[in-house]
């Protein structure tokens, strides 16, 4: 063990013998990989290390005490809940402590006012089921129901259900944040009372410390507790069916998916505009053909049999709009929405196609933890939240650039990715995922990741993956402009010793400097020495 012995003993006195360890076998359990989100990259090989100790505090008070000890004894730490986000949620420097938040499992649901009050160890699965038991629902993001609810509220956390339900940052209510040196900030109504019912008022507020469209991955402290807004649902039960891994939710009469094959992409986009304008539907998305192959396949081998019969032409003419209607108030509500939907589709030339009377992917997201693993590794290389006009152009540019990096990236025949409308069409969303076999030479994966940032700058796309996800000195001068100077000033103010998940938010800059295969990509100005502490 390399962590200061006095610090270790002090943390043990707080959490108890059972909830701290420096056993090498236990530390192996916190190794990044071997498969999953962003695993199998050069970033993972270069930047991640095993922790030297792990502790499991149970609440905000214990987290605050542990962090104060880390600050006193100069111990770097990483906040960690379910670890879904791959290497970026793991230790990056030697002699580091993981603060595992699984024990922060406080859980209350205010049935009258429609919100949860939960700790960081509570998963989305628990939240969604409890909400549905009480006639409400929330959003489970693409990461899956096994992820921490709070993590999805402070980083990403959307899905086709975001067509109607507000984006995550709008649903953050009273929140407890442990700053990098241990002080506790209470946000929203918690600043003046014990009831977490309210987030913040209009205009800028402290929730901007937690996230933009994505989050800062723990480099500005630890969110230990949060109240999360839910919305009313319909009263009938969604019944689990099938035997794992082929499970689904059987939908009641007032909940139903519809698929429409559109004649072309402009009609596909216009349908999303009109559905939002009519203020109908609970969920709305484009369906890539890749998803359909995954849904049909029983295993990876069958997936490849289905997928490799496709080509650029078959994907070019595939324009599916998938819509979920929910009769929130009554069957008449559902019938009205269905009539409006059919009128829109008739006008635009959309033809209904068959779809199952069940849900496998979005209401509870039971399949998302494994459905992307057709190659062994994957990552959402970028996503944007802008207008539908921009979002629907974004993927085509990505698909063209991706040809340069295929292989090692999976052949996808020019598939431009996934897009949908957010918040009744007021915003558009585009996401581009990539897949590869981590057992092969994956230098091109890391290179493509950075090349997409250059592409965004060239085409003037707004990208959500700023901050710690790309080289800060590449994107910073071009967005804002100079948003990186503000981010680094905030980091220096709240964490001057860089003990909260170092070297984030400069981790990707550090990776580019350290990885030989990334040197050819580096054509932007960067300081000779990055303005961060060296551990």
Where are these regions (language model features)?
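Short beta-strand-to-loop capping motifs
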Residues: 58, 259-267, 322-331, 383-390, ...
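Long, structured ligand/cofactor-binding scaffold of large enzymes
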Residues: 37-137, 148-160
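Conserved glycine-rich FAD pyrophosphate-binding loop
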Residues: 44-52, 65-68, 74-76, 80-96, ...
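C-terminal cap/substrate-recognition region of VAO/PCMH-type FAD-linked oxidoreductases
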Residues: 202-205, 211, 227, 238-247, ...
């Amino acid at each position: 063990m390399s962590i200061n012995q006095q610090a270790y003993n002090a943390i043990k006195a707080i959490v108890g013998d059972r909830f701290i360890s420096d056993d090498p076998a236990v530390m192996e359990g916190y190794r990044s990989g071997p498969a999953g989100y962003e695993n199998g990259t050069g970033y993972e090989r270069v930047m991640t290390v095993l922790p030297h100790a792990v502790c499991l505090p149970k609440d905000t008070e214990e987290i605050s005490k542990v962090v104060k000890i880390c600050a006193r004894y100069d111990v770097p730490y990483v906040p960690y809940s379910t670890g879904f986000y791959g290497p970026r949620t793991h230790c990056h420097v030697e002699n580091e402590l993981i603060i595992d938040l699984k024990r922060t499992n406080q859980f209350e649901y205010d049935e009258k006012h429609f919100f949860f009050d939960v700790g960081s160890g509570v998963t989305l699965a628990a939240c969604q089921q409890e909400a549905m038991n009480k006639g409400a629902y929330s959003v489970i993001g693409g990461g899956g129901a096994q992820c921490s609810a709070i993590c999805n509220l402070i980083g990403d956390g959307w899905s086709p259900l975001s067509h109607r339900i507000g984006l995550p940052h709008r649903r953050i209510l009273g929140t407890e944040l442990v700053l990098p040196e241990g002080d506790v900030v209470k946000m929203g109504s918690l600043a003046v009372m014990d009831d977490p019912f309210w987030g913040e008022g209009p205009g800028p507020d402290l929730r901007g410390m937690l996230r933009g469209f994505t989050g800062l991955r723990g480099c500005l402290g630890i969110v230990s507790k949060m109240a999360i807004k839910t919305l009313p649902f319909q009263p009938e039960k969604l019944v689990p069916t099938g035997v794992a891994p082929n499970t689904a939710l059987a939908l009641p009469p007032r909940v139903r998916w519809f698929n429409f094959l559109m004649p072309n992409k402009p009609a596909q986009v216009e349908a999303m505009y009109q559905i939002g304008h009519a203020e109908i539907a609970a969920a709305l998305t484009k369906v890539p053909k890749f998803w359909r192959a995954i849904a049909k396949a029983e295993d990876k081998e069958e997936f490849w049999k289905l997928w490799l019969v496709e080509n650029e032409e078959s994907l070019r003419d595939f324009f599916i709009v998938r819509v979920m209607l929910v009769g929130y108030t009554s069957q008449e509500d559902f019938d009205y929405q269905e009539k409006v939907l059919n009128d829109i589709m008739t006008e635009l030339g959309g033809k209904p196609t068959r779809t199952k009377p069940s849900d496998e992917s979005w209401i509870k997201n039971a399949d998302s933890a494994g459905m992307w693993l057709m190659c062994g590794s994957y990552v959402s290389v970028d996503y944007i939240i802008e207008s539908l006009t921009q979002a629907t152009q974004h993927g085509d540019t990505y698909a063209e650039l991706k040809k340069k990096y295929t292989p090692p990236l999976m052949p996808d025949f020019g598939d431009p990715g996934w897009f949908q409308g957010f918040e009744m069409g007021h915003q558009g969303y585009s996401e581009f995922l990539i897949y590869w076999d981590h057992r092969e030479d994956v230098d091109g994966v890391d290179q493509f990741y950075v090349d997409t940032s250059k592409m965004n700058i060239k085409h003037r796309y707004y990208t959500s993956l700023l901050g710690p996800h790309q080289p800060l000195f590449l994107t910073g001068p071009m967005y804002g402009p100079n948003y990186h100077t503000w981010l680094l000033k905030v980091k220096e103010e709240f964490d001057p010793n860089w003990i909260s998940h170092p070297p984030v938010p400069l981790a990707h800059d550090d990776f580019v400097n350290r990885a030989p295969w990334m040197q050819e990509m580096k054509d932007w100005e960067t300081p000779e020495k990055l303005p961060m502490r060296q551990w």
